[in-house]
Amino acid sequence: MKRICICGGGNLGHVVAGFLAANGCEVTLLTRHPERWSHTLHITTPEGTTLEGQLSIISSTASDVVPQADMLLLAQPGFAIRSVLSELRDVLRPGIPVGSIVSSTGFFFEAMSLLPSTTPLFGFQRVPFIARTEVYGHSAHLLGYKSSLNLAVERASREDANRIASEIQQLFHCPTHLLASHYEASLTNSNPLLHTSRLYDLWHNWQEGITYESIPEFYSNWTDN
């Protein structure tokens, strides 16, 4: 059984933790708010099913959840990455891969400066899921999958990089391809393009006096306009 430590409890942290736990991984969670979490996570899927994942340990202390992990996966905003890496580096076992679901907010640069050179690093070019929390610490929605994933791996031999990519493919049930350099993930930030175009689509016809009966959904009501 693969032992995965998820660091972070946002939308992606909820869905990734629940998804991996429901698919046979032993999942521990590092979060600032352990008291708000249930050990059972319910994740709804686009197919209409609900995944149930059991978290083995939930803690705000890295030494409780990191030492036993076979892989660490950060689900953190950019401003929090440095402090989380600083906390976990002293309890991280040698050679354990550390990765980030979001790589365009400085993960590789911070990890290379803080973690031992023997620590393999990996990061997604795009997030694997569209995720939304329903009830914090209890349930979330997996709203969409990627058809394939691109992964950057650094500080690893080609053989080890291929092994990490293969493990990610198995964990996320999605074809996974290696990028040539972490720069392909670090410098590819899609949100400034996606978010501004979506906001234009929502509001470009707005005029003073126009009101709305409901709050529009950002992703689920996406159009091709």
Question: What are these model-derived regions, one by one?
Answer:
Residues M1-E47, V66:
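NAD(P)+-binding Rossmann beta1-loop-alpha1 motif at the extreme N-terminus of oxidoreductases
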Residues K2, S147-L149:
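Nucleotide donor/acceptor-binding cores
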Residues G24, L55-S56, A69, G95:
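Short, well-ordered alpha-helix to beta-strand connector turns
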Residues L41-S60:
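N-terminal glycine-rich dinucleotide-binding loop that anchors FAD/FMN and/or NAD(P) in oxidoreductases
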Residues Q54-Q68, H177:
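Short acidic low-complexity segments
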Residues L73-L74, G78-Y136:
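Rossmann-like NAD(P)(H) cofactor-binding subdomain of soluble oxidoreductases
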Residues N150-N225:
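Active-site-lining helix/loop region of Rossmann-like oxidoreductase modules
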